[in-house]
UniProtKB/Swiss-Prot annotation:
SUPFAM superfamilies assigned to the protein according to its UniProt record, in alphabetical order: S13-like H2TH domain
InterPro entries, A to Z: Rbsml_uS13_C (IPR027437), Ribosomal_uS13 (IPR001892), Ribosomal_uS13-like_H2TH (IPR010979), Ribosomal_uS13_bac-type (IPR019980), Ribosomal_uS13_CS (IPR018269)
Alphabetized Pfam families for the sequence: Ribosomal_S13 (PF00416)
Family to which this protein belongs: Belongs to the universal ribosomal protein uS13 family.
Name of the protein in its database record: Small ribosomal subunit protein uS13
GO biological process: one example: translation
Function: Located at the top of the head of the 30S subunit, it contacts several helices of the 16S rRNA. In the 70S ribosome it contacts the 23S rRNA (bridge B1a) and protein L5 of the 50S subunit (bridge B1b), connecting the 2 subunits; these bridges are implicated in subunit movement. Contacts the tRNAs in the A and P-sites.
Length: 123
């Protein structure tokens, strides 16, 4: 079983798809990695030789931010936006959509469940 960046890649999948199980690697990045290391994208993960796995592992460690490092960087970027008080930072702090979506009717995922507003009862 190939283990790259602390993630066990699924054995039966093609290498191209298997690499996408690592946080921070999508299909284009996966294809770039395989092209740079000279590994055939159609090879199954279980059929990879130890040299190919090591080549992929070395390339990922040197050239791609993945898993914990990437998550940490994203978290720090959001924290910086909140601290400097930018519009995006304020939206993050209030748990509202950050990218300009309307919030009058939608944005339920970001805002959470509806809260009932208590009002006067009619007699």
């Amino acid at each position: 079983m190939a283990r790259i960046s602390g993630i066990d890649l699924p054995k039966e999948k093609r290498v191209e798809i298997g690499l996408t199980y690592i946080y921070g690697i999508g299909l284009p990045t996966s294809q770039e990695i395989l092209e740079a290391t000279g590994v055939n994208p159609d090879t199954r993960v279980k059929d990879l030789s130890e040299e190919e796995v090591n080549a992929i592992r070395d390339y990922v460690n040197k050239n791609v931010k993945v898993e914990g490092d990437l998550r940490r960087e994203i978290k720090l970027n959001i924290k910086r936006l909140v601290e400097i008080g930018s519009y995006r930072g304020i939206r993050h702090r209030r748990n509202l959509p950050v990218r300009g979506q309307k919030t009058k009717t939608n944005a339920r995922t970001r805002k959470g469940p509806k809260r009932a507003i208590g009002g006067k009862k009619k007699k």
